[in-house]
């Protein structure tokens, strides 16, 4: 699943852990309350711990600190950091570009939908629970 601009904005708005009414969110995003509800269902599929309360709105179970791409780039000035909210696999992203990468180049994401662990087992990484990082480094033989 890709993270559309509307869904990214919803996550940003909800990251404070406070209640936000569907009407308020819809007004801020220029969409209907029904559309807000559909986007919330999609965000739950990413593993976000969202809940709703009649008369109060939607909220995350706990506040969430989202990464700041500019700050990450500043902390790693030697090599580019490719940042994503959602990606299939950080490792696969680098693997597909291996001939164009420089040493230390990395890929960072808040959620992977097709991550792989040891022996090809699925790597579960719901949104907002961790930062996933893969780094390219060429080792001389």
Question: What is the predicted function of each stretch?
Answer:
Residues 2-141:
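N-terminal lobe of the biotin/lipoate ligase/transferase fold
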């Amino acid at each position: 699943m890709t993270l559309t601009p509307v869904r990214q904005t919803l996550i940003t708005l909800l990251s404070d852990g406070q209640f936000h009414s569907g009407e308020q969110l819809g007004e801020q995003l220029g969409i209907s309350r029904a559309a807000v509800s559909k986007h919330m269902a999609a965000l739950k599929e990413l593993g976000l711990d969202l809940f709703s309360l009649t008369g109060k709105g939607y909220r995350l179970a706990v506040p969430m600190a989202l990464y700041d791409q500019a700050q990450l780039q500043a902390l790693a000035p030697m090599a580019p950091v490719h940042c994503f909210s959602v990606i299939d696999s950080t490792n696969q992203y680098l693997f597909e570009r291996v001939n164009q990468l420089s040493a230390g180049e990395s890929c960072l994401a808040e959620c992977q939908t097709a991550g792989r662990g040891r022996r090809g087992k699925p790597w579960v990484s719901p949104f907002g629970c961790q930062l996933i990082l893969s780094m390219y480094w060429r080792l001389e033989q």
